[in-house]
């Protein structure tokens, strides 16, 4: 940005460990148009920051949030622990499949919103939901997938290990007036065991794991709840194939597969899979 030159903001040199600006992250709501800028800096003080903000907002009125993250470690991890709101809100708002979501600097939110809607709608269609269904949303994040399911079912139970994401999911449920979605910060295995003891019997378990896929312990814990269906959203075909094979060993049958291209002209692909229980 021109501001970097005008205000002499030096980029961080990883080898020399000099400079101020490590990363500039821009988030933009596809439907809202709201923008967030996140400056990742090596130290707390940004010289003439008020003037920088004034210039940015004047040139880009869609910017509703400017955040500073401080990362003084010699690491390739993008964010440090401390976030400061320099201007506006600490979130921006966007919508997906009719629901609104507050998105913070740390929130996971698909960058290709239009195709993410197709991805989630495919998962909904595959699951063939009824008003009596109970859905467990493992790896629930800020609630984007589970809340998309919620209007079609009796209840959604979401679990996520990142506490901030769980708070975001609860806030997003309230933002949309959704009262049948419940979120906890826990490991999926432990949460499912607790829910099972409390008599919760899911008809669908929804999973959207990271690239490493599911653990064997997770698969065993999910199978123990005996859901009729497992709807699996994957970003890694190799680990997805491995996990499907294990589900098949536990009595589940692969019913449907649909790739969805969220990242055109790359080798990355998202895939929605439906498995159903054929025996106990």
Where are these regions (language model features)?
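Residue-level recognition of strand-loop junctions within catalytic nucleotide-signaling folds
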Residues: 29, 42, 276-278
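Short, aliphatic-rich beta-strand segments
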Residues: 26, 33-42, 100-104, 204
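Internal alpha/beta scaffold segment
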Residues: 1-15, 19-20, 42-67
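Short edge beta-strands and adjacent turn/loop segments
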Residues: 18-31
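Intrinsically disordered, low-complexity acidic/polar segments
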Residues: 33-35, 46-48, 75-77
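A short linear hydrophobic-aromatic micro-motif
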Residues: 10-13, 24-25, 255-259
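Short flexible coil/turn linkers enriched for glycine and charged/polar residues
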Residues: 30-33, 62
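Rossmann-like S-adenosyl-L-methionine
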Residues: 51-58, 62-280
